[in-house]
Regions:
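Binding-site signature for planar aromatic cofactors or substrates
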Residues: 1-205
Length: 205
């Protein structure tokens, strides 16, 4: 990221910079936008937020991809109401970026199988092979057990389940809200979806 290059950006230049940073975050584990916060709506408890990992960005289609366990509460929430928002924050730049849109949940098809083929032989695959669903209560002895021990048990119990509970979340961005917190003066810009892309406007911070 380079804040100095945005000393006086046009909306077009700013929009291009934001997408470039998002694309970079999907490739760079150290990027501050690699782990945004995903907010969904739960009919029973209202807004729900959690940290996720940004996996892929397709600038041309304004699409961001995330992975999750299909049994996660957020999947049911998104199936009931696909509206969602990602919140990215960069402490180094003082930039906040909110990305709103609708999320499509996929548990079957090429979107899922092609990505699982790349993931299945990595350590991260164990996140989706557990016989226990995310959030399920467990005994204190299980909570205290070393992660390696649990992973080995889960691997043995679930080796029969190819692709298991792996799901892909595809967010189509409909709005981007950028805020720069700067001692010299805050700045804010909002970009809304149009057929040809995102149209932007400057706003009061």
């Amino acid at each position: 990221m380079n804040a100095t290059s945005l000393s006086g950006p046009t909306l077009e230049a700013l929009g291009a910079t934001l997408w470039r940073e998002l694309a970079g975050a999907a490739q760079d584990r150290a990027h501050e936008w690699r782990q945004p916060v995903l907010a969904t709506v739960c009919p029973e408890f209202g807004p729900q937020a959690r940290t996720v990992v940004l996996r892929e960005v397709d600038v041309a289609s304004r699409t961001l991809l995330l992975y999750t366990d299909a049994r996660s509460p957020k999947v049911a929430q998104l199936q009931a109401d696909p509206r969602a928002q990602l919140l990215c924050w960069s402490r180094a730049l003082g930039w906040q970026l909110r990305l709103g849109g609708r999320i499509l949940v996929s548990t079957e098809g090429l979107d899922v199988t092609s990505r699982w083929a790349l993931l299945r032989h990595t350590r991260a695959a164990q996140d989706y092979l557990s016989p226990q669903r995310p959030g399920q209560p467990i005994a204190a002895t299980e909570a205290d057990a070393p992660a390696e021990g649990l992973a080995e048990t889960e691997r043995a119990d679930s080796s029969r389940a190819e692709r298991a509970h792996f799901a892909v979340l595809r967010l189509r961005v409909e709005r981007m809200d950028w805020l720069s917190l700067d001692p010299q003066g805050h700045r804010r810009a909002v970009f809304d979806a149009r057929d040809a892309g995102l149209s932007g406007r400057w706003c009061v911070p």
